[in-house]
Amino acid sequence: MASFVESGWQYLVTHFSDFQLACIGSFLLHESVFFLSGLPFIFLERQGFLSKYKIQTKNNTPAAQGKCITRLLLYHFSVNLPLMLASYPVFRAMGMRSSFPLPSWKEVSAQILFYFIIEDFVFYWGHRILHSKWLYKNVHSVHHEYATPFGLTSEYAHPAEILFLGFATIVGPALTGPHLITLWLWMVLRVLETVEAHCGYHFPWSLSNFLPLYGGADFHDYHHRLLYTKSGNYSSTFVYMDWIFGTDKGYRRLKTLKENGDMKQT
């Protein structure tokens, strides 16, 4: 496996510059992972497949789904890509590299774990601030246009929010100056996590059924169903911040009622 990764990386660094890999390569990787993981949930919703695992019974119209995709492409090319280009000198100054030797798996794992921890902390407070009255009305309400989320709505947001909450994702790598392969792995994991959290389905194989403190779709779907500034469930990947500060009480109360059979799923 190591030799396969090294040979593949050797091809990339031989044929492309550091700038091309870090900027264009990162953008193409993000787009590929995001749309390949998110589009199937549109198909599931339209066809009604696996509907017994759907958290909400409501479906989005094809027009609403199309609007989301169109807006995403606009923002990805007009906000995300320029941001990647502009941040390249910063990451280089902080020590990011694409050259050999590749980092060990221990180093990669330690950095990824650090990124998750710091991203959860920064995202929680940033997200909670966005639910203040003025910011929710003028910025964050765009993301909440979809009360019944599907995978691609994970990145449907106001440009100001993209920049604001995007800081939570890049602050960890900016602090450590990782190898580009570590940054790519972090980006892939983060994209898959946020798509899953917005997918609208809670499957028997969902990570939240096996991984302690992992939020997942059921946790975040509750946040979207309540169109209020105090909806709670502000966490990103892991939910310990909501538990510590008591902002998941409504969700936990609802979950207890469901488990006791006192109410039906809506």
Swiss-Prot record:
Its EC number is 1.14.18.11, 1.14.18.9. The keyword Endoplasmic reticulum applies. Disulfide bonds: none annotated. InterPro entries: Fatty_acid_hydroxylase (IPR006694), Sterol_Desaturase_Related (IPR050307). It is a multi-pass membrane protein. Expressed in shoots, roots, siliques and flowers, and, slightly, in developing seeds. A motif (Histidine box-2) lies at residues 140-144. Residues 113-247 form the Fatty acid hydroxylase domain. GO terms for cellular component: chloroplast envelope; endoplasmic reticulum; endoplasmic reticulum membrane. It catalyses: 4,4-dimethyl-5alpha-cholest-7-en-3beta-ol + 6 Fe(II)-[cytochrome b5] + 3 O2 + 5 H(+) = 4alpha-carboxy-4beta-methyl-5alpha-cholest-7-ene-3beta-ol + 6 Fe(III)-[cytochrome b5] + 4 H2O; 24-methylidenelophenol + 6 Fe(II)-[cytochrome b5] + 3 O2 + 5 H(+) = 4alpha-carboxy-ergosta-7,24(24(1))-dien-3beta-ol + 6 Fe(III)-[cytochrome b5] + 4 H2O. It is an enzyme of class 1 (oxidoreductase). A motif (Histidine box-3) lies at residues 219-225. It is found in: Endoplasmic reticulum membrane. It holds the Pfam family FA_hydroxylase. Its cofactor is Fe cation. A motif (Histidine box-1) lies at residues 127-131. Disruption phenotype: No obvious phenotype. The smo2-1 smo2-2 double mutant accumulates the 4alpha-methylsterols 24-ethylidene lophenol and 24-ethyl lophenol, and is embryonic lethal, arrested in early stages with an altered endosperm development, probably due to disturbed auxin flux and responses. Keywords: Endoplasmic reticulum, Iron, Lipid biosynthesis, Lipid metabolism, Membrane, Monooxygenase, Oxidoreductase, Steroid biosynthesis, Steroid metabolism, Sterol biosynthesis, Sterol metabolism, Transmembrane, Transmembrane helix. Belongs to the sterol desaturase family. Requires a membrane-bound cytochrome b5 as an obligatory electron carrier from NAD(P)H to SMO. Together with SMO2-1, required during embryogenesis, probably by maintaining sterols and auxin homeostasis. This is Methylsterol monooxygenase 2-2. It comes from Arabidopsis thaliana.
